[in-house]
Every structure is written in C-alpha cells, then in structure tokens.
Design a protein with these regions (language model features):
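Ubiquitin-like/PB1-type beta-grasp interaction modules and other compact soluble beta-rich domains
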Residues: 1-258
Length: 258
C-alpha cells in the first residue's frame, strides 16, 4: 500500500472527493494492523475532515459499522472495485472491504428493502458464528471446475495468518478456507502471490490451480461467498482471496470462470 496515495476515486452520489491515505486511522483496530484501513474508514475520514456530515454506528448484531445518514440523507450502500476492475454489486461489510492502492469507492442511495436484506444476512452470519462457539464452520464448500465437481459440508476454517501484515492474528479469509482443505488433503491447490497481473495491481494471493484445473489468461477460478436464501449476484465481487474476510456465511463456492 502506498501510504501517501492521494486518491480521487471516491464518489458519494455525483460528488467526488480526494483524501490522503497517510492521514487515515481505522475504526476497526481489532481487524486491521496499523497502516491499513477499509472503505468505511475512508468515509469516516471524510466526515472527520468536514467534507461530509456522516452519522454512523457499530451494530454488534451484524458485526459491522453501518451508515445512518450522509448529509442528512439515509439509505446509503456502495460498490467498490480494485485497480483495473469494474463496478460490481456486493453484500460485503464495508468495514471489512480493504482499501488498496488504485481502488474506487462509490456510494449511492439504495432501496430500504435491499439494505434490510443485506443486514439480515449479516445478522444470520453472526448468529451462526455464535451458535458454533466462535468457530467459523461453513455449511458447505462447493467446487465446480472445468473437469471436476466436489462438495464438502461443515468445514471448520483454521486461520493460517498468511496476511498477518494487514490483519490481526486469527482473522479468517477465503485463503484460509483453501489452506484448511489443502492441509486436510481434501484438495490439491497451488496458491501464489501476485504483485501485479498485467497492468492490474494485485498485492495478494491468487488461486493458480485446483485439483488439476489451472488458470490461463482470463480463464480460471472465481468464487462467491454468501447465503443460499438470497440472490447470488451480490456474492461475486472480485476481491482477492487473501483479503476476503469471512464471518460465517452459508457457503463458499469456487467455479470455473471463462
């Protein structure tokens, strides 16, 4: 991360904002190590600088910060994407979405029923984690490759702390899920660190191959994380596996993307 990055890629409605990332501190020190912050932290910073009137709170029932209003207006949601990416809908906690160099963040007014659907998912995740005594146990892991299909049930994910420069020890991500299955000899996968891929800034781990299916060019593995009860389009933002934090979703699915 370039800590002196001055980014113009933040929009609230039709208004754009600049910020100096060296000035930011996270409101989630239990998740991020010093020097790292989330998309939500960018909003808090804009509020503290007087650029917007931000009202927010932390809701423990959802394990996330929520925006109550911006400049007196309610019902905000967001989309974001990383360098060389494109806009994607999501149902991912904004304070878990790591800010990276070259990222874009845009907030927009959403339908209240849409927001309540997302908040319901968050509450279900927290409840599931509590019912499992704080352990992350995935109801189902699905793998649908070019040449294989596998499913695993009740997968307890173990933190490997491979992103310990960014996250506090014990944080669990999609990367940890893959490493858990690999350590148990349930899958054979090759995971490598990429600083860049083509022109895109990555700075994360990439699933290169899984049980013989290996990516090439734009063909390879993608994934989604979410709930079977809600439309799946919200669960596929292109977030690298090392920085997609997991609380306790219904499932994780890896699929072959052409």
């Amino acid at each position: 991360m370039n800590k002196s990055d001055i980014s113009p890629n933040v929009w609230i409605g039709d208004e754009s904002f600049l910020f100096d990332s060296s000035e930011l501190e996270t409101v989630s020190p239990d998740l991020y190590n010093p020097g790292y912050f989330s998309m939500f932290d960018v909003m808090v910073h804009l509020g503290s600088q007087g650029h917007i009137d931000l009202k927010y709170e932390f809701d423990p029932s959802m394990n996330t910060h929520i925006i109550n209003s911006i400049n007196g207006e309610k019902n905000w949601w967001y989309f974001s994407f990383y360098h060389e990416g494109s806009p994607e809908q999501n149902a991912y906690r904004m304070d878990h979405y790591l800010w990276k160099e070259g990222a874009t963040l845009r907030l927009y007014k959403a339908d209240p029923s849409f927001l309540e659907t997302i908040y319901h998912l968050f509450r279900e995740e927290v409840k599931r984690r509590e019912e499992n005594n704080g352990k992350l146990i995935l109801n189902k892991v699905i793998i649908r490759g070019a040449n294989l299909e596998k499913e695993f049930e009740d997968v307890e994910v173990i933190p490997f702390n491979m992103m310990k420069d960014i996250y506090r020890e014990g944080t669990t991500t999609v990367l940890d899920m893959l490493m858990t299955l690999k350590e148990q000899n349930r899958i054979d996968c090759d995971i490598k660190w990429f600083k860049r891929y083509g022109k895109a800034i990555i700075n994360d781990y990439w699933l290169v191959s899984l049980d013989g299916d290996k990516f090439a060019g734009r063909v390879g593995w993608a994934y989604e994380v979410g709930s079977f009860k809600v439309w799946r389009g919200l669960h596929r933002p292109h977030i690298p596996i090392g920085c997609r934090v997991l609380i306790s979703p219904d499932y994780v699915e890896f699929f072959w993307h052409l």
